[in-house]
Amino acid sequence: MVRQAKGDGKAHTVQDSIPFRNIFPDGLCRLDGGDFSKTIAYEDVNYRLAGPEDQRSIFESLCDFYNGYDPTIGVQMTLSSRYVEHGPEEDLFGIRPQGDDLDPIRKDAAGILRFQYERGSNGYVKTKYVTLTIEAENLAAARARFARIETDTLNRFKVMGAAAHVLDGKERLELLHGILHPEGGRFAFDWDWLAPSGLSVKDFIAPSSFHFGETRTFRIGEMYGAVSFLQITAPEIHDRILSEFMETEGNILVTMHIRGINQNEAIKMVKRKITDLDAMKIAEQKRAVRSGYDMDILPSDLATYGGAAKTILQDLQSRNERMFNLTFLVMHMAATKQKLEIAVSQAASVAQTYNCLLTRLDFQQEDGLMSSLPLGLNRIKIERSLTTSALAVFVPFVTQELFMGGESMYYGLNALSNNLILLDRKQSRCPNGLVFGTPGSGKSMSCKREITFIILTTKDNVIICDPEDEYSPLVKRLGGQVIRLSPSSTDYVNPLDINLNYSDEENPLALKSDFVLSFCELIMGSKTGLEAIEKTVIDRAVQKIYQPYFADPRPENMPILGDLMEALLAQGIPEADRVAQALDLYVNGSLNFFNHRTTVDIRNRLVCFDIKGLGKNLKKPGMLIVQDAVWNTVTINRAIGRSTWYFVDEFHLLLKEEQTAAYSAEIWKRFRKWGGVPTGATQNPKDLLSSPEIENILENSDFIYMLNQAAGDRKILAERLGISAEQLAYVTNSEPGHGLLFFNNVILPFADDFPKDTELYKLLTTKPSEVEHAAETET
């Protein structure tokens, strides 16, 4: 039978139990009485692996954070770890069957991501919030005061390096819905629905039922829950206690209600405590004299408490310390009572490790649940007074996460949190990338993995410069085009290919002429470069040989090196003859491999230039020609709005020669504007420090994937990227596929261990024994 509400002050519906009056579109929440609250979400920062100085800086900033709130502002810190049910792996990672030959690879890739996802802790979404509560006469007064408080709070998070934003009304409702629906369920809400339906915002977040019939547990729908409080009995608290609570299994919500005490009242309170302790000390001394004992022998607790109280008084009077009251709550949710007890026991073990006690609330489970909601309401009056420094030891930071939306791709697991690292490099200010690692550390495999996911999850083009013929099996399996450049090959690429979009200037010949100058300089082998007259005759010849093509842009009108040589000879001056004679070896001589029109399809989405077969004399111009072919493709794709990824293995080979190094620096400088995403893989970072021009490649790379590093290279990376000694441990004698990721100034340790019993792993691996075994299996 439904009981009617008769003004008895009790909650008669689930909605009545949720302790707020209303939430407004701007995120302002009206509580009972004259209290109002707002919630701010903030991101994690790299604390655990930061150096001692950086950790100290974060700690001091956290002290300033708490000191910035006067006693009229309530502060509620909320740390949530909640399991979110996902659909099939293709829904989560965007890898869907297409009904073609790549579906087995797609299934492998999706399965591997699902394996890594479940192996890590990504089923659990970890979020952090601070809810601020004030008292105000009305909505207008509350909004006016919160305007200043929000700005100050966001600035304090910025100082700590944590991104933060104020939740609007819908975001707050979604947050509450997630907590009140621990079994999952989609949140659907729109402000326009309220008036026609006659419903309140509570109707969109309320669970099916609350049950508070038991003394130490409660139920939300079919889920079981329990709220405990932390008894801080340890003389000192470790800064990892919060993070270890959040690393326990199961749905957990850690709440810290913090309220500052007026400084004068705090000092008076401590002085009264000292006076009481002194009175107890005098009483003990009198008792000792009467009993014939030494009056200096006092109970140890009395001496300890007296010294601690005087230290606190000194901190309050002469240091930047304030006093706060803290209520520390831990709420668990589980599908069964047994799972709930296991989760609570795990958290209790963490508390015991740090000499604290996690005690279940008796007969206060409803108040505990409502106090755990990020509303800024605290009904549990179990408080512990702490100074600013003691409070700030509860550091809410562990490690930053990289879990982006859009066309994000997998780059391993965060070695600290076990969460997937999903990035969309194209969202970066500068998506250029570098991969560093000693031989056998996994450089090529990491590039292959990224290439695979680009092909499977985007519509972008990929071009590979492959000096060691390591990528051909993967490229063929993914339906790509392998172009073998060697004197014995019939795969020809014309170095003089051009398209009308070759430059963003009106005249595309300007940039093409620059390439031809670099090519001629390379084959002439002059240490001092081309002379001014030589540059003039080359440019004059370039202008002439492209006239037929621009007049009638058909493939058969595209010039080749032989046409360039003839145009030089036709000028009849010694400087032109000298350049023509240098070209003769590449036109009529034994190195005439590049004196042909292009015979291969470089319009395929995936193209691999295999340059292993180019001899010593052809490899240098060959690498330059590949770079120019890449530029051609990038300009074509830019016109149709498609990105082009360019992977260069053994990148140091390009950096050795002045011409290819200069061309590489130009690519790293200009590719972003043209929709290009270059990535260079090499062993040693010092290869990029040989000149200021090459050094710009490192400066212009916001994605750096660091595998195992030699000692000298570790030092270079630490200085250049600001890597701490603790972080460097992840690139010191690390296993293959393990290291550090630098992305947009975020540095994360990662682990990328692929299951080996898959077709995809066999395509990615570069270990000789595994490659041979895969080849034998295919035959």
Residue ranges of predicted features:
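Hydrophobic anchor at the beta1->P-loop junction of P-loop NTPases
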Residues: 435
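H-loop/switch region of ABC-family ATPase nucleotide-binding domains
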Residues: 682
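Walker A/P-loop NTP-binding active-site region of P-loop NTPases
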Residues: 441-494
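Extended, folded cores of ATP/NTP-driven motor/assembly subunits in large transport
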Residues: 1-399
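P-loop (Walker A) phosphate-binding loop of NTP-binding proteins
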Residues: 438
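Conserved AAA+ ATPase "SRH/arginine-finger" region at the nucleotide-binding site
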Residues: 483-488, 703-712
